[in-house]
Amino acid sequence: MTSLLQVRDLSVHSLARPILHTLSFTLEAGKILAVIGESGSGKSTLALSLMGLLPAGFQPHGEIRLNDENLLTLTEPQWCQIRGKTLGMVFQEPMSALNPTRRIGAQIADTLRLHTTLTRSEIRDQTLALMEQVGLLKAGVSERAYPHQLSGGQRQRALLAMALACKPALLIADEFTTALDARTRADVMALVHSHTKTHRMAVLMISHDLGLVRHHADHVLVLKDGICVEQGPTASIFDAPAHPYTQALLAMSLHGAAHTPLSRLPVYTVPV
């Protein structure tokens, strides 16, 4: 069976400096893959590569196949067709994606307007349904509210509603639970899990929260200096890590150092 997402020998360079080195992995429909590693390991560069949003000067090489289509060959208009429809995105800081001058309901509706043939009334109904799903209506948030009138957690819920609006095949979630309180984090992850089961949505989740990763991810990929040092089923990675870097990373979490910067981990040289 062909995987939903196939990444083969993906390398990214910036001004001749390598950031990702021949990275390869697959992701099945309905599964969650967590990418972990210290800051600067290449996690966000991977996410931006998958979304076609690399900054100018960053050169990707290799293959990123989604539904067997090589995304690295797409033009920008073609990328615009799949972002928000086949490919959903949620970022760590919602205000980097939300327009501060437009109402929340209108921004959620934009995704439906761009990628569906729903009527105006159907779009409004679906917008309200999405706001209900992510818990905004229950929290008393109106579709006419502006982003600055929402709490950080509510903004993240609004961004998730936009990302899930068209039932994407793949959701890229880059540190999207970092700023959330425990209750909101649990609610958001429950909603994501619901979509993996009911819509077979795959999720690539970038996180420093190893407890969250262990509880929710099906597979884990460990990045160090742009290189995958280890990947496999979550239970295998957490219970029997093979690489010294992975062992140190998990040991820190186990010993109550979850909030210690990963940059303080022992240094291991990874051959290029």
PLM regions: where:
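A short, surface-exposed alpha-helical micro-motif characterized by mixed small hydrophobic
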Residues: V213-H215
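Conserved ABC ATPase signature
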Residues: A145-L150, Q154
